[in-house]
Amino acid sequence: MKHTIARYKRHRFPPEIIQHAVWLYYRFNLSHRDIEDLLAERGIIVSHESIRLWCNKFGPQFSNRLKRRRQGFSDRFYLDEVFVKIQGKQQYLWRAVDENGDVVDVFLQSRRDGPAAKRFFKRLLKKNQGEPRSIVTDKLRSYGVAHRDLCPDVEHDSSLYANNRAELSHQPTRVRERVMRRFKSMKQAQRFLTVHASVYTLFNLGRHLVSAKSYRFLRSEAFESWRVVSLT
């Protein structure tokens, strides 16, 4: 409880309310004003600006704790990159997911050339604490450069349609981008996408693949993990 008090020191609202607001923001397609209204309906009067500050401050903390609790990813990674417009300039969002659709990493860069691909590969290898068994990408040549220089022994599949899993994984980001009316800066976008990926992965339970009983059990475990990282 001492850690909880220290983390939420100088905040007049209880930790339970703050962590719930942060969870709502990163779990669902809601704006800060939407969450302000949801809390007001429960008799909790807090400004959308306070909610924004909570999300910016505590979101990365919770995300880092979730990553430390994670057991690991599957041994097959799907990589893809899409462009996002930030302050009128085209940037590239690199993303890697595993076979379960869990997000391994997201990384914003201004290019998608060989050096950019190598930077992304280095992050992946560091986060995974080693090489995966195989990687799946599209036919962008930059992936071949990074694969040859950094992990030549890893199987590399770039066949047509093999990378659909990674391409589909961008959809939640596109939805949030519209809700937020585009990202305001590289720093803000990287922070949001990193936390969003951690929360998405925690609650990515494959609802359509398991029974209702199994889903409720997995959901309870996910909620417990969230309580641990946010309230202890």
Residue ranges and their predicted role:
Residues I45-V46, L53-D75:
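Short, basic alpha-helical nucleic acid-contact segments in DNA-binding proteins
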Residues R12, K57, V106-N128:
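Active-site beta-loop-alpha junctions of metal-dependent nucleic acid enzymes
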Residues S31-I44:
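DNA-recognition alpha helix
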Residues V179, Q190-T232:
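C-terminal domain-tail junction helix/linker
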Residues A21, I35, I51, D80, ...:
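Mobile genetic element proteins and their domesticated derivatives, centered on retroelements
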Residues F73-I86:
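Two-metal-ion RNase H-like nuclease active-site motif
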Residues S159-V175, K184-Q190:
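RNase H-like two-metal-ion nuclease catalytic core shared by retroviral integrases
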Residues N29, Q87-V103:
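Short conserved beta-strand segments at catalytic cores or DNA/RNA-binding microdomains
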